[in-house]
């Protein structure tokens, strides 16, 4: 398919508005302020650069702030996000499997900066795990796409049903089901079932701080930080982990595992209240005592241009 019409989705140009308020005076370390101001400047310059490159290409495009995005994205051939993984995650909730997306990391972490400032504060910037481009290679990556030298990867997302009703939001990274108060105990049970009707032999009853399920793309995020393992990016499996289980006993080995595309997880919620957090704070749904939640990889895939695929294609030229 020829790509002629693009949407440029932007992280807010001023991502740190508090720098313009009196609150900024509470930051005593001047290097912190310089670092934050630098991040704003680098991001603004990246937006300007991407717009200049697009203006030279035979495409129609328009920019929009991610804060102004409120409806499904249609009638475009591709979405380009400029920001970090959070901006691409935000975009994913408005994109189905018909529109590919390219992420541009506008402010990548600088290893030398992190090292120089490590004794003062964390100077990490944007990881950009899902972003295939930066300012350094944006034009080359864009040309690879426009000339059809690279195709997007089909990345799995999580489908959710709440009391048998399908939720419209699909998680690209992960979901967390937990109490609204992080200090409260979550009570629930789950069972892995096959879509042909068979189920695992054991229902797992849990008291814990919640249940996290991730896709392959999300396995490098919170799941890995919690002790999970990194999955191949194109895997359709889902990984789950019960967070901080209380006295799991004989079910300890069942608290962290995976399930296949021909399976789903059936969760029964036994606390008074709960929340399904989809891709961090992107989307939330409330649950209550007695609710059932069905989790699977049945959601439409997201077509994402990944750096690995682009580097493979480029090595042929």
UniProtKB/Swiss-Prot annotation:
It is an enzyme of class 2 (transferase). One of its GO terms (molecular function) is ATP binding. GO terms for cellular component: cytoplasm; cytosol. It is found in: Cytoplasm. Two-fold decrease in activity in the presence of PPi, iodoacetate or para-chloromercuribenzoate. Its EC number is 2.7.1.86. Its main location: cytoplasm. Phosphorylates specifically NADH. Can phosphorylate NAD with a 100-fold decrease in efficiency compared to NADH. Prefers ATP as nucleoside triphosphate substrate. Can also utilize UTP, GTP and CTP. Key source of the cellular reductant NADPH which is an important antioxidant factor. This is NADH kinase.
């Amino acid at each position: 398919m020829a790509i002629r019409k693009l949407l440029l989705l932007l992280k807010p140009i001023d991502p740190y508005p508090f720098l313009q308020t009196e609150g900024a005076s509470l930051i005593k370390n001047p290097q912190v302020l310089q670092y934050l101001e630098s991040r704003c400047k680098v991001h603004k310059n990246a937006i300007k650069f991407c717009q200049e490159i697009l203006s030279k290409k035979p495409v129609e495009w328009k920019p929009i702030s991610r804060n102004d995005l409120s409806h499904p994205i249609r009638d475009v051939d591709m979405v380009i996000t400029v920001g970090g993984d959070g901006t691409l995650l935000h975009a994913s909730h408005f994109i189905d499997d018909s529109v590919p997306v390219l992420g541009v990391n506008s402010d990548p972490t600088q290893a030398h900066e992190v090292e120089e400032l490590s004794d003062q504060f964390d100077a990490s910037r944007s990881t950009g795990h899902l972003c295939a481009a930066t300012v350094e290679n944006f034009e080359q990556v864009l040309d690879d796409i426009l000339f059809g030298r690279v195709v997007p990867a089909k990345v799995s997302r999580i489908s959710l049903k709440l009391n048998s009703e399908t939720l419209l939001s699909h998680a690209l990274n992960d979901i967390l089901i937990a109490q609204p108060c992080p200090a409260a105990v979550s009570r629930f049970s789950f069972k892995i079932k096959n879509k042909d009707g068979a189920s695992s032999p054991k229902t797992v009853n849990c008291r814990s701080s919640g249940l996290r399920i991730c896709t392959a793309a999300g396995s490098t995020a919170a799941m890995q930080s919690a002790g999970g393992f990194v999955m191949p990016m194109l895997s359709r499996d889902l990984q789950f982990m019960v967070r901080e289980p209380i006295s799991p006993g004989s079910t300890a080995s069942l608290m962290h595992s995976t399930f296949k595309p021909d399976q789903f997880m059936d969760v029964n919620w036994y606390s008074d209240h709960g929340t399904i957090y989809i891709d961090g704070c992107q989307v939330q749904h409330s649950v209550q005592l007695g609710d059932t939640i069905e989790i699977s990889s049945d959601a439409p895939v997201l077509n994402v241009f990944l750096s690995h695929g682009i580097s493979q294609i480029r090595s042929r030229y």
